[in-house]
Design a protein with these regions (language model features):
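Glycine-enriched alpha-helix->loop->beta-strand junction motifs that scaffold or abut catalytic
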Residues: 97-105, 159-164
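A general structural motif
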Residues: 8-10, 45-49, 78-80, 99-102, ...
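Acidic (Asp/Glu)-rich catalytic clusters
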Residues: 41-44, 95-101, 126-136
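Hydrophobic faces of well-ordered beta-strands that scaffold small-molecule active sites
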Residues: 11-13, 50-52, 81-83, 105-107, ...
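Auxiliary Fe-S-binding modules of radical SAM enzymes
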Residues: 131-191
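Canonical radical SAM enzyme core domain
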Residues: 29-41, 58-100, 109-119, 147-151
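Canonical Radical SAM [4Fe-4S] cluster-binding loop centered on the CxxxCxxC motif
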Residues: 1-36
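Short microdomains enriched in Cys/His and/or Lys/Arg
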Residues: 38-56
């Protein structure tokens, strides 16, 4: 019996390769960025979820929330737009724009500095911004095994305060995209 090929439902969309971290196990070191296929209109018409990734998306020169709105307007099939961030650049850009069209923010702190930025954000954000984050469809906080003790002893309350679903993870040395997902990039990276 021939293997059935699923149509892609989820697109991980790299919008830039710029990042403020030099993580030892960064997944961007696993592939040649120039060989990542460019997202096509045909592919965009098949997905219901777009996960904005980078590099660090909040270091781009665009308004991420407006980008999410434009994706949904141009591709009505796109129901969900999520963004992945280490947290630091997100906190530095928090007041530059609102969070009305993103369906969720996935935080993946990689350093103690990232954790401290999330701590600062949870304590000092304006209430309207904090509420905007809390009311997204799905917010996640990825806690890598190297940071479990740090998280459990110092930062666990942040997840509750910002309504983040905690997912404990290990660094994958090799990322394999599931059959119903694709990894693409913009034709011009927004560094």
């Amino acid at each position: 019996m021939a293997e059935r090929k699923l149509k892609p439902e989820i697109m991980h969309l790299m919008i830039l390769d710029n990042c403020d971290h030099k993580c030892n196990l960064c997944c961007n070191k696993m592939y040649d960025i120039d060989k990542i296929p460019v997202a096509t209109v045909e592919e965009m018409k098949t997905v219901h979820t777009v996960c904005i990734t980078g590099g660090e998306p909040f270091m781009s020169n665009i308004n991420i929330d407006r980008f999410a709105l434009n994706l949904k307007k141009q591709f009505p099939n796109v129901e969900n737009v999520y963004v992945y961030t280490s947290g630091s650049a997100f906190v530095f850009n928090i007041y530059n724009f609102g969070y009305n069209f993103l369906d969720g923010i996935n935080f993946a702190p990689k350093t103690k500095g990232d954790w401290e930025q999330l701590k600062y954000a949870s304590a000092h954000l304006r209430e309207d911004i904090r509420e905007s984050i809390r009311t997204r469809k799905s917010n996640r906080l990825y806690v890598f095994k190297e940071h479990v003790d740090l998280f459990e002893n110092n930062y666990k309350y942040i997840a509750k305060k910002l309504n983040l679903n905690v997912l404990y993870r290990t660094w994958d040395k090799e990322f394999k995209t599931p059959d119903n997902e694709i990894f693409r990039r913009l034709p011009i990276l927004l560094n």
